[in-house]
């Protein structure tokens, strides 16, 4: 069976991921007029820039959808977002600022839940608005086929007939008007935005040029913290975790995780927390640039990692970071549910996140400027009395430390011999300006 269809399958059911925007509206109407039977599926991901979800399926029916469904994906999206925080599944960082993989998380949820809904309706052909140059075309392909092995893919934007007729936004708008729908194009921004409850992505157009900056972006989840005329008073916030799960903000608990994430977004958003400017490597190895917002994810991540460093030992923290970066890449590539990702997730959630219980109090200021004011946990292995500089009882004595240092002579001697061997073979310079200490040949001295 051909998985990817290059031309419209006339007379067959096609499920389209319908956003209600110009592109998917024109595509749905065009498919109906050309003889296909379109079914519209809209994911409610808690997009901060969407005002009326219920109106979207109604518009789809007006444009010719055989049926239109609104799928509430918020609970699953937040669950995957919390799992990503527990695992540190983030691999893109610049100058200490993190991209929280909010778009890949959204695609993992959308790609599985919409295709599952289509399968319930007997729809085995799926179309969406992703382009052939981006990451989403592969993410949706993978998640769709994982959910429905019989799935076929039809994308109007890969169909030359569709492109020839409606290749641009102006042509799409004219087509909608000619068909009796007063669809006016929205005002063009200097960049493109995609969002869900976890975060927003701003990219393309003017943001493709590196001499543009965050200053051209109008945040949809936060504030323009770089604008000094915007007043942003400092604010204290306390985040509580129980066994790796965020359960309270400023002492307030929530009936569900969706409400908790919304409140985290509101708190972080008041300061512009979690905005970052990243150059990243797409799945096809070409570099792209994006400016990201994720105020709630950033707030939870900061508090989580503060507890992490106070609870776990150095080797565990090292494995958390290494495996988290690896898992972040898998998530980015659309492999969040692959076996290698599930293995990493299970170990990180079982052995790391399960011990993260406690509270962290932060002072948020402008943007990513914050201070940690207090850290409290019954699981802390940070115990100041062990290393206090004040006189008093100690868990080890000066003689104990002398013995420990004496044992270091073994590996110091081995290292000295290795350095001499490198120098003898010419790998190390004998220059006095070398950063490596000058190593004397001790063989002739019987050492």
Curated annotation (Swiss-Prot):
Its main location: cytoplasm. The keyword DNA repair does not apply. ATP binds at residues 17-25, 43, 129, 131, 136, 194. GO terms for biological process: argininosuccinate metabolic process; L-arginine biosynthetic process; urea cycle. It holds the Pfam family Arginosuc_syn_C. The gene is argG. It comes from the Bacteria. Pathway: Amino-acid biosynthesis; L-arginine biosynthesis; L-arginine from L-ornithine and carbamoyl phosphate: step 2/3. SUPFAM superfamilies: Adenine nucleotide alpha hydrolases-like, Argininosuccinate synthetase, C-terminal domain. This is Argininosuccinate synthase. It catalyses: L-citrulline + L-aspartate + ATP = 2-(N(omega)-L-arginino)succinate + AMP + diphosphate + H(+). Homotetramer. It is found in: Cytoplasm. GO terms for cellular component: cytoplasm. The keyword Acetylation does not apply. GO terms for molecular function: argininosuccinate synthase activity; ATP binding; protein homodimerization activity. InterPro entries: Arg_succ_synth_type2_subfam (IPR023437), Arginosuc_syn_C (IPR048268), Arginosuc_syn_N (IPR048267), Arginosuc_synth (IPR001518), Arginosuc_synth_CS (IPR018223), Arginosuc_synth_type_1_subfam (IPR023434), AS_cat/multimer_dom_body (IPR024074), AS_multimer_C_tail (IPR024073). It is an enzyme of class 6 (ligase). L-citrulline binds at residues 99, 135, 139, 192, 201, 203, 280. Its EC number is 6.3.4.5.
């Amino acid at each position: 069976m051909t998985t990817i269809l290059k031309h419209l399958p006339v007379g067959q059911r096609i499920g389209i991921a319908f956003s209600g925007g110009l592109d998917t509206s024109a595509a749905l109407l065009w498919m109906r007029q050309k003889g296909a039977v379109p079914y519209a599926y809209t994911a409610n991901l808690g997009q901060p820039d969407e005002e009326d979800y219920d109106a979207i399926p109604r518009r789809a029916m007006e444009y010719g959808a055989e049926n239109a469904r609104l799928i509430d994906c918020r609970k699953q999206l937040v669950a995957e977002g919390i799992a990503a925080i527990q695992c540190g599944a983030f691999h893109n960082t610049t100058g200490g600022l993190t991209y929280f993989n909010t778009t890949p998380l959204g695609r993992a949820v959308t790609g599985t839940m919409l295709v599952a809904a289509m399968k319930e309706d007997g729809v085995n052909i799926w179309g969406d608005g992703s382009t052939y140059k981006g990451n989403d075309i592969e993410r949706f392909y993978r998640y769709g086929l994982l959910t429905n092995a019989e799935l076929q893919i039809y994308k109007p934007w890969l169909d030359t007939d569709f492109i020839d007729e409606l290749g641009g936004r102006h042509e799409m708008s004219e087509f909608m008007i000619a068909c009796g729908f007063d669809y006016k194009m929205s005002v063009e921004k200097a960049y493109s935005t995609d969002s869900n409850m976890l975060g927003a992505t701003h990219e393309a157009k003017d943001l493709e040029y590196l001499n543009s900056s965050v200053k051209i972006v109008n945040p949809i989840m936060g504030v323009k913290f770089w604008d000094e005329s915007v007043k942003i008073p400092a604010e204290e916030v306390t985040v509580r975790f129980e066994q790796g799960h965020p359960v309270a903000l400023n002492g307030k608990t929530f009936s569900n995780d969706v409400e908790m994430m919304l409140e985290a977004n509101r708190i972080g958003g008041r300061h512009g927390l979690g905005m970052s400017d990243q150059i990243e490597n797409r799945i096809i190895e070409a570099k792209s640039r994006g400016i990201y917002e994720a105020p709630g994810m950033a707030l939870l991540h900061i508090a989580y990692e503060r507890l992490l460093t106070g609870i776990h030992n150095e080797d565990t923290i090292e494995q958390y970071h290494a495996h988290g970066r690896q898992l972040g890449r898998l998530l980015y590539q659309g492999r969040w549910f692959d076996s290698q990702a599930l293995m990493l997730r299970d170990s990180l959630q079982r052995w790391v996140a399960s011990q993260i219980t406690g509270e962290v109090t932060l002072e948020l200021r402008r943007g990513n400027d914050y201070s940690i004011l207090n850290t409290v946990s019954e699981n802390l292995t940070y115990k100041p009395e062990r290393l206090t500089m004040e006189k008093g009882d100690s868990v080890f004595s000066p003689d104990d430390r002398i013995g420990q240092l004496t044992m270091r002579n073994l590996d110091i001697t081995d290292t000295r011999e290795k350095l001499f061997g490198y120098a003898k073979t010419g790998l190390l310079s004998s220059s006095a300006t070398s950063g490596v200490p000058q190593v004397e040949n001790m063989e002739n001295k019987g050492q």
